[in-house]
Amino acid sequence: MDCSCVSDLLFAPPALPALWTPGFAFPDWAYKPESSPGSRQIQLWHFILELLQKEEYQGVIAWQGDYGEFVIKDPDEVARLWGIRKCKPHMNYDKLSRALRYYYNKRILHKTKGKRFTYKFNFSKVVLVNYPLLDMAAAATGSPLLLTPSPFGGAPGPDAPPLTPETLQTLFSAPRLGEPGARTPLFTSETDKLRLDSPFPFLGSGATSYSKPPGLLGPYGRAFPEYPWNFNPYLTGPFPKLPPSLYPPHFYPNPLASSLGHLPSSGAGGGPTATPLLASTGEGLGPERPSGLAAAPRLALPGAGGPEAALGGKEDSDSELEITDVSGCSSDSEGDEGLPAPPKAKAGKGGTGS
């Protein structure tokens, strides 16, 4: 059924407080066309703003304290009016307060600590839009703008566009794609020109949604000096092109160095190198042999001498090669190393039997 019980709220001329006008709303995600006053789909914070505009409800809900702060003087009456508007006769303040807590996370409003039934709108999120009551406020005050500080921290330049509701709406809210009949965006995409004209042109170049507000970013007309690292950070491109010397080593890995690291080398490291490998086989030992390889293991046959004898006697021996470390061994006949053992024992054994 249709609920037009409080429709007279919409047609009475609004009472304008001294510090604000009713032509404001919040970001695009909170403002919907079907949430306009007079609609059953209105949101609770819109309804609260409507009540705050009416002098006849000053005993029910009213502004007080800091800018944007209001107090609900009669919670049951506010809940009853909200139930009439939403066609919910069983509405009470407990349900209404739960709906208000939903806006805490959205940062539309928050509860004032230490004050009962007192809330405060977060006007840092407020943007001007074509609110239905804006025309009435403009006719009554001559200006549709809120009496708030400029969001740009100062007066606009001479070539800046006039501050209109559409201007601030475009500044503070992202464009919604796919909406039929959407407003013409205030900013036009001039990414290349913006990159050259803005103070930080190296921050990006391919962002199609990044646009330049006319009259807000002036040309950066000074000549940039020469830099000691021989590059200009204001070059065009998606990212600044710094020289490799300014980056950490992992940005520019050396593939040649990484591939050579797996090859054996004759460095001072403690790993196996090519020279010890040759030293262990007795080949390639020249005058450049390091002194630390004097005690390297050698290949030797049982009863044979140095590496020459070991390599020469390999064909005549049926036994397998044994790796023998003779560096620490001592012998009485060290000078006769490499000579076969004299057949003394064999001759003595035969002599005893004869």
Swiss-Prot record:
The keyword Transcription applies. Pfam families: Ets. The lineage of its organism: Eukaryota, Metazoa, Chordata, Craniata, Vertebrata. Residues 42-122 bind DNA. Its main location: nucleus. This is ETS domain-containing transcription factor ERF-like. One of its GO terms (biological process) is regulation of transcription by RNA polymerase II. GO terms for cellular component: nucleus. Keywords: DNA-binding, Nucleus, Transcription, Transcription regulation. Residues 290-312 have a biased composition (Low complexity). Residues 263-354 are annotated as: Disordered. One of its GO terms (molecular function) is sequence-specific DNA binding. InterPro entries: Ets_dom (IPR000418), ETS_fam (IPR046328), WH-like_DNA-bd_sf (IPR036388), WH_DNA-bd_sf (IPR036390). Belongs to the ETS family. PROSITE patterns: ETS_DOMAIN_1 (PS00345), ETS_DOMAIN_2 (PS00346), ETS_DOMAIN_3 (PS50061). It is found in: Nucleus.
